[in-house]
């Protein structure tokens, strides 16, 4: 192996603004396969760490792949430090996790990382399931999120169903959802963005609710009828990008929602089953 060594000057290492830890597909636009190009459109450097590697989502007639083995997963994380690629790291985001053991490995890595990066923004999308499908991850993942990742996160982005699972509370109306979100706040966890709160069905609206200790902001967006997958992953990519570019939380959430709507409508124009990113207009 040593005879192949070419790059040993760590001062030349490419640096990341963001490490994105979530699923990856060979075909399609979910997980890091949509998040990475979206983040790069915002002019930020991102390193993608896969938790599962799949041919495509399970919504097609064939489907291959699975969770990344723990040895590989821990090695991917360790290698970023061995390459000295995290000197300028500002944020870590997480999405779909393959196993509870991955969550524990990631939490241990984040805990060590925070010693050198005390201001690191950790944003967790606790992907567990939704109202229509129920839980679609391994049954031990919700407890792993509660035990390992929520105590490290500064912000989380659950949907209503995931908020119910994490808190054990009914969240089907706005007041109860807000109360449940507030019950999760702590010295570390500063905000919860509920990504699918109750909206106005008659007016074709959906709501995103931003909950912190000091305020609650309800943001309404037009509802787009679609079966497109990966919109939540895109939302989180846009949200973390907006925050790192200096936007206030509620403004970043609003802008992320508008961008998702723009991408969905653009994709529909091309009659595609997978999200297509249009160029990003500078504000």
Curated annotation (Swiss-Prot):
Coiled coil (UniProt feature): none
GO cellular component: cytosol
Binding site for substrate: 23, 59, 233
Top class in the EC scheme: transferase
Pathway field: Cofactor metabolism; pyridoxal 5'-phosphate salvage; pyridoxal 5'-phosphate from pyridoxal: step 1/1; Cofactor metabolism; pyridoxal 5'-phosphate salvage; pyridoxine 5'-phosphate from pyridoxine: step 1/1; Cofactor metabolism; pyridoxal 5'-phosphate salvage; pyridoxamine 5'-phosphate from pyridoxamine: step 1/1
Reactions catalysed according to its record: pyridoxal + ATP = pyridoxal 5'-phosphate + ADP + H(+); pyridoxine + ATP = pyridoxine 5'-phosphate + ADP + H(+); pyridoxamine + ATP = pyridoxamine 5'-phosphate + ADP + H(+)
Gene Ontology biological process terms in this record: pyridoxal 5'-phosphate salvage
E.C. numbers: 2.7.1.35
Free-text function comment from the UniProt entry: B6-vitamer kinase involved in the salvage pathway of pyridoxal 5'-phosphate (PLP). Catalyzes the phosphorylation of pyridoxine (PN), pyridoxal (PL), and pyridoxamine (PM), forming their respective 5'-phosphorylated esters, i.e. PNP, PLP and PMP.
Family: Belongs to the pyridoxine kinase family. PdxK subfamily.
Protein name: Pyridoxine/pyridoxal/pyridoxamine kinase
Lineage: Bacteria, Pseudomonadati, Pseudomonadota, Gammaproteobacteria, Enterobacterales
Gene: pdxK
